[in-house]
Amino acid sequence: MQYSHHCEHLLERLNKQREAGFLCDCTIVIGEFQFKAHRNVLASFSEYFGAIYRSTSENNVFLDQSQVKADGFQKLLEFIYTGTLNLDSWNVKEIHQAADYLKVEEVVTKCKIKMEDFAFIANPSSTEISSITGNIELNQQTCLLTLRDYNNREKSEVSTDLIQANPKQGALAKKSSQTKKKKKAFNSPKTGQNKTVQYPSDILENASVELFLDANKLPTPVVEQVAQINDNSELELTSVVENTFPAQDIVHTVTVKRKRGKSQPNCALKEHSMSNIASVKSPYEAENSGEELDQRYSKAKPMCNTCGKVFSEASSLRRHMRIHKGVKPYVCHLCGKAFTQCNQLKTHVRTHTGEKPYKCELCDKGFAQKCQLVFHSRMHHGEEKPYKCDVCNLQFATSSNLKIHARKHSGEKPYVCDRCGQRFAQASTLTYHVRRHTGEKPYVCDTCGKAFAVSSSLITHSRKHTGEKPYICGICGKSFISSGELNKHFRSHTGERPFICELCGNSYTDIKNLKKHKTKVHSGADKTLDSSAEDHTLSEQDSIQKSPLSETMDVKPSDMTLPLALPLGTEDHHMLLPVTDTQSPTSDTLLRSTVNGYSEPQLIFLQQLY
């Protein structure tokens, strides 16, 4: 028994493995971009990769950037794994160049056809009627308009509607004088109505005169539409001609015979290539129709086919598509972590170098990201907090803080632990919680080597070495290293005791004192209850980590975690550059070749990045 969708299912699975980097045994390197894939899949579609992998067992294949662009190769890779190829005017050349270099013949053929179509649309007036010269008796030097049969009224039809609308102009639909069969009407592709041919009144009055127009003297453009051609039928070539004298503007029909032969599909212009004659109000409007088409085509804004988002440039769309495809071409050469955007990689590298380029003008404090500087200014220097809660009127420095705060009112907890089922309002809180299960402590102190599960805990701990105490009590002036310590001290002024023992009702100002009490007095109590109290009663540090927003204060800069921060293990500790707490490293410090702990390729990577 054969399953009809087995091949599609296999390709779908392989593509998901590629996007996840699972079982990928090769990496295609194009400049700073890296693409993971499977050798057997590439070799099956590309003669180039087939030849490469027959002669080498190397995992990395480096491609020439001048021959294969990263964006073109990405589209080609998607076609190989999915069978889908989206070609447009701004990527077809890159894809064709990549496919031709890598010998993917099927894509080369598709691209050639598409490029011909785009060239036809961009230059519709360049359609050559000479391609059917052998089958059509047409004099290219002169255009002959003969009205011999005008006086024979019964053989002509005049559009009375048009005459009523414009008394100065009439319409003439010429019947065939060379066949007894009823001629089919030439219909508009859009309206389906019969075409009417317009003549100025002075020409109609002298209709018995043969008018010869020299084709070489005709001003451009001449817009041509050719009707469908059948055997033994006549070819109607309708032309809009702008004469040198405005009063003599003419829209005329030329009827020529064609010899027997197969129909010529190239004769009929595509509907969208030129405007319909029926819709032409004045011959002057056709003067720049080709240029207007090119402008409309070039001004078409690229749009994402997945989410419908519109972009001003094709390059922005290509960067956006990496989000949908899961492509992360920007790779940190120091730790191997990959990112979708180049600016994300630069921000991430600062976790290695310690660089903080964004300085506060008031307190000279440095930050790795601009958004952190904005947050700091709003929190500590009186700048406006533009985001206000509709329920309690609290104001916040960032929209994300307001969104998290709103979940306190709604009770929403969208982040669920897949190990124990506990729910959280913040993604970062879930991350910290999972580390309780795994025991992971990726943040290591440079001075003493102590490890922490949360970056804010490391920041607070480092102040013990530097002596920094930025949090000052407004009542007595005493300073502290963390907001948790300040809150604990402040309770000594207010007398508040928020931590209550569930067994005996005693209350304490500090969670540590509550734990000591339970250990000393209730050591034989149910451990489950004690564990539950730990989960629902937060310590001062946990309050910072898990609930950065309280009802009375915003998150502090020290409590924020870098969204792109790299979890450093003990073995990665040597990769941090030696910098002080008060000054960010200069470019010379970052790029000097004598930095310990970096290999030569890593130093080259840093120099190229900056």
Curated annotation (Swiss-Prot):
Flavoprotein among keywords: no
Top-level taxon of the source organism: Eukaryota
Pfam family name, one: zf-C2H2_6
SMART domains listed in its UniProt record: BTB (SM00225), ZnF_C2H2 (SM00355)
Regions of compositional bias (Basic and acidic residues) in chain numbering: 523-539
Name of the protein in its database record: Myoneurin
GO cellular component: nucleoplasm
The family this protein is said to belong to: Belongs to the krueppel C2H2-type zinc-finger protein family.
Gene name of the record: MYNN
Gene Ontology process terms (BP): cellular response to leukemia inhibitory factor; regulation of transcription by RNA polymerase II
GO molecular-function term, one example from the UniProt record: RNA polymerase II cis-regulatory region sequence-specific DNA binding
